[in-house]
Amino acid sequence: MKKEFLWGVSQSGFQFEMGDRFNRNLDTRSDWWHWVRDPVNLKKELVSGDLPEEGINNYELYPLDHSLAKELGLNAYSLNLEWSRIFPCPTYGVEVDYELDGNGLIKRVKITKETLRELDEIANKNEVYHYTHVLTNLKKLGFKVALTLTHYTHPLWLHDPIESRDTNLQNERNGWVSQRSVLEFAKFAAYLAYKFGHLVDIWATFNEPMVMVELGYLAPYSGFPPGVVNPQRAKEAIINIINAHARAYDAIREFEKEAPIGIIANNVGTSYPKDPNDPEDIKAAQMTDFFHSGLLLQALTRGDLNIEFDMETTIKVPHLKRLDWIGITYYSREVVTHSEPKFPEIPITGFRGVPGYGYSCPPNELSKDGYPVSDLGWEVYPEGIYNSIKAASEYGKPVYVMENGIADSKDLLRPYFIASHVAYIERALESGFDVRGYFHWALTDNYEWAMGFRMRFGLYSVDMITKERLPRKESLEVYREIVENGGLTERIKREYLGVRGREDDSR
């Protein structure tokens, strides 16, 4: 791989930051903070009962985590800054001029120096100071910094998940259902570029925004806020998220002229038909991919907005065409079959997942195709990352693998997982695809959203009492060797590839 290729790890604020001994660094103003402790959610067992304040304390221990990443030989680090920490109180009062297009979308948001001054007055200076130190430390250690604006979480003043659930999104603080969120996101983006632009090498607006919509608005038992079924509101949220990305892009570009700006999408080109000879199943796989990521990426790379959610009816919206790179996350595939649309309002939901493959497997067994399965019940299917890169590349932008990892507390599968996925990334590069980086999820164990601390994704395990980082030695050795050599070595190929899984004969 090229010398400029980025080798890194990824993390998010809410999942990693909290957990100091005296609870001095809590973020109590986010939607997820309130969601995971809600009595209704706990009673229904939609959330684990684990709380983020019991976490790994990256807020204080970030110098240690950065040094561990440096010892691995990594040259890049991906993270987000928590919106609710920087702006725990609303930014609505900071007024901005904006312009609508003929379709009612926000075409332009005017961010001025006065806007930034007003935002700076209400920002939490302690958190700005803290994040400045975090990013500065990364730069001092020689990392390329990939900064995401938001990773699932939102300030409570923007999205109250309990109100949203109880009113079926008819409340004011209903997140991306409200177009005003587009304006607030543009302000947030501008402020981060203004304050931290000199410390950031690569920008992303959203991490997996469709996950928020699919699980929060269409899958009430997923454990994601606000836990409702409201297809019409889901459509509105998707349009607003697309619009918000474009306006955040413009806001960043106003103050940061060179750093590339992208978005991190999930399940790009990872759907497979149950019967590859059945036209209906083939169509179902195409719809699945389009729903997860194609609708989003088509709008942001071509300015084609599929307003009817049917893969056909598009309108040209040139001011949405704002994207420099595409980030993909890849954990497993999906195998789907044709069905009637789950939601008639969203025609592209005419698919159904097939149990025994992808994300729908019994934990720690074998999938129906004989592949190993993680602690989380996700099939290890490394071939899929090649197809994901190929699908993302069709949009004509450079590709970064921004998340790839496995829940594997005993570290039985992770060494093979890393080696096999890197092998398919190398194959993608050999095929001519412009892949520029690989970020492993994650450096350490962390808080896996509604599932709490049960799923262990880290190259380092974490003692949740002492917060000690304990190396998962074999995975660390494999990843370190790959990074040091710029790709797979003959030893790794010989010892790990061609072997799908190994028995636990020593632990």
Language model segments and positions:
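Chitinase-like catalytic core of GlcNAc-active glycosidases
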Residues: 57-58, 89
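Active-site region of glycoside hydrolase catalytic domains
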Residues: 1-46, 89-91, 100-119, 124-507
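Surface-exposed loop and membrane-interface regions of Gram-negative outer-membrane beta-barrel proteins
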Residues: 52, 86-91
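Acidic/histidine-rich helix-loop elements
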Residues: 44-54
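Catalytic domains of carbohydrate-active enzymes, especially glycoside hydrolases
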Residues: 60-82, 321-325, 391
